[in-house]
Amino acid sequence: QTKVGSHPRFLRDFSKEATTWSLENSFKLLRTDYVDSVLIHGPRYDIEAPLQECLDVLVDWKSKKRLGHIGIGVRQPEFHRRAIETGEMDIVLSFLDYTLLSQSIAKTTIPLALEKDVGIILGSPLTGSLLAGPEPKIDVEKELPSDLPPSLIGSKLDPAVLPVAHQMWKWCDDRDLNIRDLAIQFALQAPVEGNGIVLTGPSNLKEFDEVYKSATNEVPKNVWQDFKHAFGISI
């Protein structure tokens, strides 16, 4: 898989020129003439531009058997809906919105994607580092915009989510549980009916092993029952 719209040379440039250059550059770096999927990556406030020249290029490359599937990775569910409505999307990637802290796409993107047989990628199940195991903290020294862009709302850089994340971590820590186990297994139980995957985003082998361990550790039913009683969340 590769993506368009994210290279520093053409960041969030969804023109025909930028899209074509990005694809050619990715294929060159990957030393391939075919990829299974390409995602339109990260439009922030405008969904129409990516669905014009950029999508046209991807559809053309797909027709020429250069790529297998077309997708979009973006935060807003209304952007997912608009993309799915084109009839050209095979995949939608969402992030931060099916976690222990937020399940908003369970009522928006997931039902629509299932109805239209569009694959779902659920990203950031650990909400950055907030649900990764260590005590949740936000870097108060990091300068943030007064109005967070959509991609950062509810993220590890959003002070609004820290209190609940810390309460969940403390609840687990008091019981010798790892919050990461619950976070990963909750995401894996998302109601995608076999038509989706969870993208954890490990940056090294150690993190990969930690995620695998959390996915396969046994979490007793009574733990989920108690967690639901405390936070209203369960599998």
Question: Where does each model-flagged region fall?
Answer:
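Generic anion/oxyanion-binding catalytic loop in active/binding sites
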Residues: 8, 15, 24, 171, ...
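Active-site groove signature of glycoside hydrolases
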Residues: 27-46
